[in-house]
Each structure stands twice: as C-alpha cells, then as structure tokens.
Amino acid sequence: MSKGYRITASTGIHKGDRDYQQDQVNLLSHSRSPGCMLGIVADGMGGRSGGRKASDQVMLTAKQLFERYAPESDDAPSMLRQIIEEAHIVIKLTAISAEQEPHSTLAAFLINPQGDCHWVHTGDSRLYHFHGSKLIHKTIDHSYVQTLVDKGAISEEEANSHPQSNILMGCLGAEQAPPIAQHFIPKLRPDDVLMACSDGIWHHFSNSEMGSALSMLSPREATEFLIQKARSRSRGIGDNLSLVIVKLESLD
C-alpha cells in the first residue's frame, strides 16, 4: 500500500428511538494481508428477532468469506457478490423460525493492500467517497423514491423526507434475488474518506454537510457528531443508526 498516507477509522452504532437494534456494522482487518480491510453495514428488517437475525447473518457471511479471501489471487468483485448471494440464501432459510420475514440491506467496501477499493451494495444503505469535503461518488438506492428521482418526479432533497422513503425495490431475504450494484476506485489517495452507513444516518444530512464533517473531523469525532446530529434531527422518531468511516490521512 502507498506510503503517502496512514489509515484511521471508526465505527458507530446506536438504536436511535427504536426499542431494539437491528443494524449491524463491522470493520475487519485481514489476518494475513496487512492493509486489506472490509467495512460493512447491514440494516435488518423483520420484527424484533427477524431483522437482527438477518443483519447478524450478513456479518457472519462477510467475516467468513473475507477470512478466505486472498488479495493477491482472488477477484474482489466476485467475493463481494458472493457475500450478498450467500447471505440472501441463508436469510431466506431463517425466515422459517422468525415471526416476520427477515430482510437486510448491505453496503460494503473492500480496500486491497495495493490501494484499490471495491464496493457492493443492495437496498438503501449507502456508500460514500469524498476527497476532502468534495463528494466523488455515492451509491444509488434500490428504493421506490429513487425511482421517482430517476424519473425527475422529485428531487434528491424531497426524497429524503418522502413518506414512502422506506419502501425498497430489493434487498437480502426478499422473494426475488437482490439487486447488486458495484463500484471500483482504482487508487485511493491521501485525503480520501470512505463511509458506509444505514438510512438512519444519511436521511438527515446533505452531501455538503456530510463532506464537511468527514473532512474536518477525525473518524471517531465524525462518527460521534453524525450520530448525535441525526438523533437531534430525528425529533424522537429516529431509526437505528450505523456507520463505518475510513480516512486516508497524508503523512506530509
């Protein structure tokens, strides 16, 4: 990995105003390949036990496949797709013992030792790439309101507060195979910031607000700030919140 930067990172999770936590988040460092890491967020749905079972299964599947992953020889996009495909199958099997059908979103980024980065997501948990405070790329939700945005019927700002913003067009555990979207960053640079987060976070911020917080604050400070501000803005009816932030800080 490039010696021009050092990596700092943080994860955060809060149940918001819900009675129980169905989000899960993790940042895994590869046991055999220094500089290889996987950041992942899963937002479970399906009652008290169903949603948590689903997001737990995402984390278990991701951990198992990441441990087997060999950066020097394996294909990163294929491994990320496999996480989605295998978690989807197992979540559907757990539906038998859950009081509601378990479902989950997934948003994950993989950083290889050489500095390339691969994304995968399904549902409305998001991935962001900022350089400094400038948004470089973010994922497009698999949601009903996103189809309205795509048609020009509503703006992105209106989508955030739309009453049907929680309707997904696909996710893990649904009847249909989940939609899978992937993205590739050939080379990460100093001052790049990556974030994966559930909708409990991104619903409450503009891209510019998020970019400012991520560029000015350390990952730990940004995690605490975004959770605190999202809690405040949700006015007592907030969703679970989860996020993982990785920042590449210049050594100069």
Regions found by a protein language model. Give the residues of each.
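PP2C/PPM-type serine/threonine phosphatase catalytic domain
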Residues: 1-252
